[in-house]
Amino acid sequence: MNGMRVLISPLSWGFGHAGRMIPLAMELERRGCEVVFAADAPLTEMIVRELPGIKTVEIPGLRIRYSRYLPQYVSIFLQLPVIVASAVREHATLRRLAKELDPMVIISDNRFGFCHKKIFSVYVTHQVRIAFPAFLAFLEPLAAWMHRMIISRYDLCLVPDY
């Protein structure tokens, strides 16, 4: 693994995704890899605080808005167009970063568009099956199919807390 460049990009829906990538980055560095994080400004600040000297690249993040009044599944459903547009932007950003950084591996923590056909791409998720409230359970097969389509674009899917 000596000298292998690994590009890690956590989802920007809070600090949890970045937080679980930090131990992975530490282990990769311990094994001789060069780790580069691609994240939005708040996550980049946290990553640099936790891993001084780590290389980071600032990229746009997706800010999901949580409603005080609507159930969260409704709030997120209403933001689906923004989520899809964000995945398209992520993919374009990654194509540019791939040329600039030439990583051998890409690790995406729930970033739907952060994979590359020519670079070994890993998708990290804690939720393979997306659960819905009981009265919307009929939508679960559709959500599962959509998530499988996303995951199938990657070379490997890791479920760290399984």
Where is each model-derived feature located?
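Conserved nucleotide-sugar phosphate-binding/catalytic loop shared by glycosyltransferases and other
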Residues: 2-5, 12, 30-80
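Structural motif
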Residues: 5, 104-105, 156
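A short, glycine/small-residue-rich beta-strand->loop->alpha-helix junction that serves as a flexible
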Residues: 10-22
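Gly/Ala-rich phosphate-binding loop of Rossmann-like dinucleotide-binding domains
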Residues: 25, 29
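Short, polar loop motifs at secondary-structure junctions
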Residues: 39-45, 106-113, 162
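Short loop/helix-cap segments at secondary-structure boundaries that form the rim of catalytic
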Residues: 45-51, 112-119, 151
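Conserved nucleotide-sugar donor-binding subdomain of glycosyltransferases
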Residues: 72-113
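Active-site-proximal region of nucleotide-activated glycan assembly enzymes
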Residues: 117-162
